[in-house]
From Swiss-Prot:
Note accompanying the cofactor annotation: Binds 2 divalent ions per subunit.
Subcellular localization: Cytoplasm
Protein name: S-adenosylmethionine synthase
Record GO cellular component, one term: cytoplasm
Location of the region described as Flexible loop in the Swiss-Prot/TrEMBL record: 100-110
Record: residues binding L-methionine: 57, 100, 253, 284
Organism: Lactococcus lactis subsp. cremoris (strain SK11)
Function: Catalyzes the formation of S-adenosylmethionine (AdoMet) from methionine and ATP. The overall synthetic reaction is composed of two sequential steps, AdoMet formation and the subsequent tripolyphosphate hydrolysis which occurs prior to release of AdoMet from the enzyme.
Assembly description: Homotetramer; dimer of dimers.
Matching Gene3D superfamilies: 3.30.300.10
Length: 399
């Protein structure tokens, strides 16, 4: 008997310690951008029992009450009771923020392309150099309506459903910390066939019984989210498999900004360049170029030019023009990858300033991305999720 073709992805809830840290970092970023759209921000957060540490480098004219932003973010997530060992009222907030390095700033504020012109007129979109070197990936597939791999899409929706049920009071014993994991079986043609395994661990009140947790999660979460045709008698369910999950959140484990980069992106289905997103303004190509790469990939697939598309971008610090652009369609392209690459260069400006202008990234829009994924979101409007370039790409390649 042949082996099944299985692929697994996971997600975590907004109350997971690492996601608490991400949301704090992005809430601070948004608060600064609301006053100073051109601020340079690299804000990191550590959370643990009773304590939040905020540190990093920020250059801005804005004044933000960091401690207030931290407490409001924790409150919004749902850590409102001291019995959780971490709540917005009593948490200690320690802030250590300094100005961005002048060595980095000189390359971001004036790209190499500008410095090499010796005072001559230059393209305004050459003004901003990449905030660091590195490579970034974007991916899209027609496997789901949101152009995301099925396993990560379902994983996000499961933990989001848990949060919705908790916040509405429908399941009153739920607490903020939770994780999900979904294993999808594929057929020999690479098409998603069924859900093989679902794992959900959710923090709960001490009074909740294992039986009621199991029944509620199966009936009100899993069956409400995963289409019935993907579940069968062979699907395996693991609900709080350790037995109990009362101690959770930052009381149970420390959290750090940028430690859930696979959850943030494609659930391991596509490569990751290694750079985290949260707490970084758009001059940091770790973030903005990853968004641009997703935008390119999604428009390719939405145009019907490929069933799957993967884009790699790379940059040198202080240089505006990407050092490389790579396209891979895994044999599903309706035109060659070389033709796609030529069209991408004409349709998308992938210099940092070009990306910022194209996606309007100087706005305080980042806090909403810090939980439940940066891509494939249908509950919020994100500029890199638009498919407004699909027709232009298609028309160019049909000539």
């Amino acid at each position: 008997m042949s082996e099944k073709h299985l692929f697994t992805s996971e997600s975590v809830s907004e109350g997971h310690p690492d996601k608490v840290a991400d949301q704090i970092s992005d809430a601070i970023l948004d608060a600064i951008l609301a006053q100073d759209p051109h601020a340079h921000v690299a804000c990191e957060t550590v959370v643990y029992t009773g304590t939040v540490n905020v540190f990093g480098e920020i250059s801005t004219s804005a004044y933000v009450d960091i401690a207030h932003v931290v407490r409001e973010t924790i409150k919004k997530i749902g850590y409102t009771d001291s019995e959780n060992g971490f709540d917005y009222k009593s948490v200690g907030v320690h802030v250590s923020l300094v100005e961005q390095s002048s060595d980095i700033a000189q390359g971001v504020n004036e790209a190499e392309e500008v410095r090499d012109k010796n005072g001559q007129l230059v393209d305004p979109l050459d003004l901003i150099g990449a905030g660091d070197q590195g490579m970034m990936f974007g991916f899209a597939t027609n496997e789901t309506a949101e152009y995301m791999p099925l396993a990560i899409s379902l994983s996000h929706k499961l933990v989001k459903k848990l949060a919705d049920l908790r916040k509405s009071g429908e399941i009153s014993y739920l607490r903020p910390d939770a994780k999900s994991q979904v294993t999808v079986e594929y057929d020999n043609n690479g098409k998603a066939k069924r859900v093989d395994t679902v794992v959900i661990s959710t923090q709960h009140a001490a009074a909740a019984t294992n039986e009621e947790i199991h029944d509620d999660v199966i009936n009100k979460v899993i069956k409400a989210i995963i289409p019935a045709e993907l579940l069968d008698d062979e699907t395996k369910y693991f609900i709080n498999p350790t037995g109990r999950f009362v101690i959770g959140g930052p009381q149970g484990d420390s959290g750090l900004t940028g430690r859930k980069i696979i959850v943030d992106t494609y659930g391991g289905y596509a490569p990751h360049g290694g750079g985290a997103f949260s707490g970084k303004d758009a001059t940091k190509v770790d973030r903005s170029a990853s968004y641009a790469a997703r935008y390119v990939a999604k428009n390719i697939v939405a145009a019907g030019l490929a069933d799957k598309a993967q884009i790699q971008l790379s940059y040198a610090i202080g240089v505006a023009t990407p050092t490389s652009i790579n396209v891979e369609t895994f044999g599903t392209g309706k035109v060659s990858d070389d033709e796609l690459l030529a069209a991408i260069r004409k349709v998308f400006d992938l210099r940092p300033a070009g990306i910022i202008q194209m996606l309007d990234l100087l706005r305080p829009i980042y806090g909403q991305t810090a939980s439940y994924g940066h891509f494939g979101r249908t509950d919020i409007e994100l500029p890199w999720e638009q498919t407004d370039k699909a027709n232009e790409l298609k028309a160019m390649l049909e000539k």
